[in-house]
From Swiss-Prot:
Record bears the keyword Magnesium: no
Gene name for this UniProt entry: FCPE
SUPFAM superfamilies hit by this protein: Chlorophyll a-b binding protein
One of the GO biological process terms: photosynthesis, light harvesting
Keywords: Chlorophyll, Chloroplast, Chromophore, Light-harvesting polypeptide, Membrane, Photosynthesis, Photosystem II, Plastid, Thylakoid, Transit peptide, Transmembrane, Transmembrane helix
Any single GO CC term annotated in Swiss-Prot or TrEMBL for this entry: light-harvesting complex
Job of this protein: The light-harvesting complex (LHC) functions as a light receptor, it captures and delivers excitation energy to photosystems with which it is closely associated. Energy is transferred from the carotenoid and chlorophyll C (or B) to chlorophyll A and the photosynthetic reaction centers where it is used to synthesize ATP and reducing power.
Organism: Macrocystis pyrifera (Giant kelp)
Protein name according to UniProt: Fucoxanthin-chlorophyll a-c binding protein E, chloroplastic
């Protein structure tokens, strides 16, 4: 009885059920999802895949933000994979730290390399990334997510000369490669922590690497 009385004031001020409004909202959400299913990146063999429902009720602005983040992470992961493979037998000449008498050649492969970087070196890396994020690699207003071109270079000219179909294909390829790279660099890092061998591909192929 007490619970019923406590709920009564809230019920008195409640609006009547509006089935038409609910149906309109559901239809709008469904139409928005359908529009995302035709976006670049929703392609065979997986198609539109959103198991966490991140864009279930999202508008175009929210979708574009998530797509920009996905592209950025994919680009970083692609650089990470290339860097991870390149450093297996390659080191910069000279010293990493004169104070600690540490040469670049003294750095091990993989994640273990971070343990050799002095604090000031780590700070330099963070500052360099921050400068690129804030001042260099910036989203072009009014363009598609991930367009950070600044103009005035040969790459921009080559891009502008491509047809819309070719540009769409290139963007889809970048998305797929970025997604694969994110899984790839994570797999290599996990493999290294499990076996202390940073290069699973080299191990499977029997290829040697100099630094470890």
């Amino acid at each position: 009885m007490a619970i019923a009385c406590a709920a009564a004031p809230g019920l008195r001020g409640a609006e009547p059920f509006n089935g038409a409004a609910l149906a309109t909202s559901a239809k709008s959400s469904s139409a928005m999802k359908m529009s995302f299913e035709s976006e670049i990146g929703a392609q065979p063999p997986i198609g539109f895949w959103d198991p966490l429902g991140l864009v279930a009720d999202a508008d175009q602005e929210r979708f574009d933000r998530l797509r920009y983040v996905e592209i950025k992470h994919g680009r970083i992961a692609m650089l990470a994979v290339v860097g991870h493979i390149t450093q297996q037998n390659t080191r910069l000449p000279g010293m990493l730290s004169f104070k600690e008498n540490l040469a670049f050649a003294d750095s091990p492969n993989g994640v273990a390399a971070f343990s050799k970087i002095p604090p000031l070196g780590t700070l330099q890396i963070i500052l360099a990334i921050g400068c690129h994020e804030l001042f260099v690699v910036k989203q072009v207003e009014g363009s598609f997510p991930g367009d950070c071109t600044t103009g005035g270079n040969i790459f921009q000219s080559a891009w502008d000369n491509m047809s819309e179909e070719t540009q769409a294909s290139k963007r889809a390829i970048e998305l797929n490669n970025g997604r694969a790279a994110q899984m790839g660099i994570l797999a290599m890092m996990v493999h290294e922590q499990l076996s202390n061998q940073p290069y699973i591909i080299n191990d499977l192929a029997g290829a040697a690497y100099q630094f470890n």
